[in-house]
Design a protein with these regions (language model features):
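N-terminal Sec signal peptide cleavage junction
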Residues: 16-19
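Compositionally biased, intrinsically disordered low-complexity regions
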Residues: 7, 74-75
């Protein structure tokens, strides 16, 4: 896998020893979104999906999806479903903005 010079890694624990959410560039035009934790389903929603839920694929305990993301500023969030409960999970060390509904979105900047 080739990583461009501007490749980045945003991954941090959401809770001390809890699940992790992350983002990393897969190549110059695609980004891999990941979630490592217990869940029934995980979805990416954001500007790059036109806010339509895109399912992450499970491999063991890790969920991921690779999405084409052009240059620019993109807001997104991961929605983690556990039974009746839905949690919004963002990488801990990422820029965040108000989502206009009392929550937050993460910000991804593609150079």
């Amino acid at each position: 896998m080739r990583f461009p010079t501007a490749a980045f890694l945003l991954a941090a624990a959401v809770a001390c020893a809890g699940p992790r959410a992350g983002v990393r560039s897969a190549n110059d035009a695609a980004v891999r979104f990941t979630y490592d934790g217990d869940a029934d389903e995980v979805y990416l929603t954001g500007d790059m999906t036109r806010w339509r839920p895109r399912p992450l694929v499970r491999a063991g305990r890790t969920w991921s999806t690779k999405v084409p993301v052009p240059r620019g500023r993109w807001e997104y969030r991961l929605e983690v479903h556990r039974g009746e409960r839905v949690d919004v999970v963002l990488p801990a060390d990422t820029e965040r903005v108000d989502d206009g509904f009392g929550g937050e979105n993460a910000v991804l900047r593609m150079p």
